[in-house]
Amino acid sequence: MGSQEVLGQAARLASSGLLLQVLFRLITFVLNAFILRFLSKEIVGIVNVRLTLLYSTTTFLAREAFRRACLSGGAQRDWSQTLNLLWLTVPLGIFWSSCLGWVWLQLLEVPDPDVVPYYGTGVLFFGLSAVVELLGEPFWVLAQAHMFVKLKVLAESMSVILRSVLTALLVLWLPHWGLYIFSLAQLLYTTVLVLCYAIYLIQLLRSPESAKQLTLPVSRVTQLLPSISRSRAFVNWKEAGLAWSFFKQSFLKQILTEGERYVMTFLNVLNFGDQGVYDIVNNLGSLVARLIFQPVEESFYLFFAKVLEREKDASLQKQDDVAVAAAVLESLLKLALLTGLTMTVFGFAYSQLALDIYGGAMLSSGSGPVLMRCYCLYVLLLAINGVTECFMFAAMSKEEVDRYNFTMLALSSSFLVLSYLLTSWCGSVGFIMANCFNMGIRITQSLSFIHHYFRESPHRPLAGLRLSPVLLGVFILSAGITSVSEAFLCCERGWPARLAHIAVGTICLGVTLGTAFLTETKLIHFLRTQLGRSRLSDKMT
């Protein structure tokens, strides 16, 4: 498969994921706004911070390294060995779920059962849901490696929407069930997710032989299960070694990704109510990251991993592939920069209004608006880091991954210390400040890698981080106008003033986007080309 074809599939995966995710995120956004009206801050804090941390830690430690290792490399591989390796995530998940569940029940502070009932049941069900999701890991990797565009988005959309619907119904009808509600909803989510992948692949294997040859490297359902053969090793030891390197890294990356939740959970720097408010603001602030950056990062990680070879310098690889990879990276960096700047500039002036509409006075009063404004700056760093690390992890050799683990260890340690100190000093805003600091360090590391990678080639993809002076001036002007508008029109002067404030922001946003369209012609050409390819591919499939 050529680099242009892989690029087209990656763009198709990203664009399809983006459009469908916008749809189902809007649905869940409305459902979650409804649910918040019926919950206490304490229950939100327990579910969204502590129990979700149990679930995410279990799944991350059990599968992240296997995902990265098994999605790397070319098409020439023994998929039976790869599937055997992926099935090891299930016993790993049982191990981590059991260990972490004991910690959550025996070592951490147990909430008041009158305020948050059925905490033990919640721990059990969230740990179980993590193991259930790991049962679908071989199917997920197989589908992702072969770029089944609509399957991933459809499965995630259906499972998230069903979880939100069940939560809303139970909160409305049986509010006294407490954590039973969220436990059942989480188990439904993982079950539906696994069934979507399993049913799709099983049906595909039962389709006519010609269709199977064009898609999957297996021909029978039983080949999806673990298998032992005397003629070959149980797993590919090169993949297993790479997975071990990524596992050491993933352990540290998890601390960086969920560091504030670990500090809140283990060091008790915030009460459960404050944890709930922080997490709501965190989820709302990261909405753009989940809608845009995550699909792009996942899809183009696949592109870079397939086009580039890990063990070779750029000068020793096919120069056509290197040129395409450099051009794509430059465009992705520009897209991330523009999206992040837009969020930062307009987020500052519209944070309080957004929180008031979404959650009422519980969010728009107190520390909520300050948290949201700080998070808007963090989104800019998050956008750039997502693209740079996406390329770096796809191009690193095993030895470079091992060396980078030491950097991650230092970052993880500094993040935990910095989070604790800043939170003790300035409250929950300290978490975002610590995240910004560490994200800046990670961006510096990945930019250094990219610069070194392309040093011997004529390509300079880091030019994507430079804006035209005209567009930069429009961003600054928009920031000033919307800040003045907020001071005079928002948010205590009623809905007519609020609507006027929204109108001012809409005009400024339109001018900003129009300027970007006229000045960033290279990015516009890239988007038109790849979106056009994805639409053509959709029509042909």
From Swiss-Prot:
Superkingdom of this protein's organism: Eukaryota
Keyword annotations from UniProtKB, A to Z: Endoplasmic reticulum, Membrane, Sugar transport, Transmembrane, Transmembrane helix, Transport
A GO-annotated cellular component: endoplasmic reticulum membrane
Localization, UniProt: Endoplasmic reticulum membrane
Family stated for the protein in its record: Belongs to the RFT1 family.
PANTHER family to which the protein is assigned, alphabetical: ENDOPLASMIC RETICULUM MULTISPAN TRANSMEMBRANE PROTEIN-RELATED (PTHR13117), PROTEIN RFT1 HOMOLOG (PTHR13117:SF5)
Name used for this protein in its record: Man(5)GlcNAc(2)-PP-dolichol translocation protein RFT1
Species the sequence originates in: Mus musculus (Mouse)
Gene: Rft1
